């Protein structure tokens, strides 16, 4: 079975590694064009391109599939199936129609919940206890195709979005392998999504960073976890702006105004929330290094 793989970030690279390891006939790898990265702004390969090159797989990096020449190039690869994982491009119908066995996708949520570009981040932001990955057929509408299979996993109470993604990548790779096996031997089945239950997970942006201490301590904790590793939660304190990477829920309560500093323990800085108390464990002052909160405030004492 001839497979074309399409993907770009780390989760996709994990999936590509898996199907290489399993010995599928991969006739082409599509990934986004090289982009400038870091302060030097040198062009950098995507994680998927790195994997493809390491295994001598042909790499294609079109900006889009608007040109007929680009579509024909894919057609000439004669794929039986196209496997898509976080490619970052919407595929037009003329591309979806090319592989005889369809275009499949691994999506990092339990569809129809959290359609969109930031599903695992929103699962953490919303305080979900469980999420997973879904294998589905691609259609013209975003993340709305028929579902083939799912795999579930609990979300740890202190787990960040980045940590969750690392686990979902492994889960997704296993599900992709299982799905391709089912397609190859003709046993795969699918069911339509219940579109009435669809929810959406739009891309995060830096306007969402500031912590709202009028919310409950649990909501603040979820916010910090969901925004880690990007774009990272922030707070203002004593005229300075801090990035906040790690927090802990405390069992105590407080009648102080939300955002009030209650004290500094050996573990972190304690602040009042709309309900409950949150402890800031790891932070980074603007222009400074990421460090444990007690270490920072020993060198920069607060007036409590």
Where are each of the predicted segments found?
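Donor/substrate-binding cores of folate-linked one-carbon enzymes
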Residues: 21-22, 32, 81-200, 207
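An anion-binding loop in the catalytic cleft
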Residues: 213-304
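A residue-level signal for conserved active-site and pocket-lining positions in enzyme catalytic cores
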Residues: 7, 29, 52, 82, ...
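N-terminal Rossmann-like dinucleotide-binding module
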Residues: 1-42
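Acyl-group handling in specialized metabolite and lipid biosynthesis
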Residues: 202-215
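Conserved beta-strand segments of alpha/beta enzyme cores
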Residues: 25, 56-58, 102
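N-terminal glycine-/serine-/threonine-rich beta1-alpha1-beta2 phosphate-ribose binding loop
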Residues: 36-78
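Short beta->alpha connector loops
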Residues: 8-11, 63-66, 87-90
């Amino acid at each position: 079975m001839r497979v074309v793989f399409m993907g770009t970030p780390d989760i996709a690279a994990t999936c590509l590694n898996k199907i290489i390891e399993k010995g599928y006939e991969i006739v082409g790898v599509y990934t986004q064009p090289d982009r400038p990265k870091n302060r030097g702004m040198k062009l950098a390969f995507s994680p998927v391109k790195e994997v493809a090159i390491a295994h001598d797989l042909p790499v294609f990096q079109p900006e889009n599939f608007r040109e007929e020449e680009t579509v024909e190039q894919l057609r000439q690869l004669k794929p039986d199936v196209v496997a898509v994982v976080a490619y970052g491009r919407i595929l037009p119908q003329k591309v979806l129609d090319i592989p005889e066995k369809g275009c499949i996708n691994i999506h990092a949520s339990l569809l129809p919940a959290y359609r969109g570009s930031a599903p695992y981040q929103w699962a953490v932001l919303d305080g979900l206890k469980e999420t997973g990955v879904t294998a589905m057929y691609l259609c013209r509408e975003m993340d709305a195709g028929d579902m083939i299979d799912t795999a579930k996993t609990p979300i740890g109470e202190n787990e960040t979005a980045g940590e969750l993604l690392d686990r979902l990548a492994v889960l997704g790779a296993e599900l992709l392998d299982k799905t391709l096996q089912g397609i190859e031997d003709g046993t795969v089945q699918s069911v339509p999504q219940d579109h009435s239950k669809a929810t959406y997970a739009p891309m995060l942006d830096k306007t969402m960073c500031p912590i709202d201490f009028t919310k409950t301590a649990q909501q603040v904790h979820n916010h910090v976890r969901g925004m880690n590793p990007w774009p990272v939660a922030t707070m203002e304190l004593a005229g300075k702006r801090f990035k906040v990477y790690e927090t802990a829920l405390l069992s105590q309560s407080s009648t102080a105004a939300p955002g009030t500093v209650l004290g500094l323990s050996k573990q972190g800085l304690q602040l009042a929330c709309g309900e409950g108390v949150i402890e800031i464990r790891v932070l980074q002052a603007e222009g400074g290094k990421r460090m444990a909160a007690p270490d920072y405030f020993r060198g920069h004492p607060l007036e409590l």
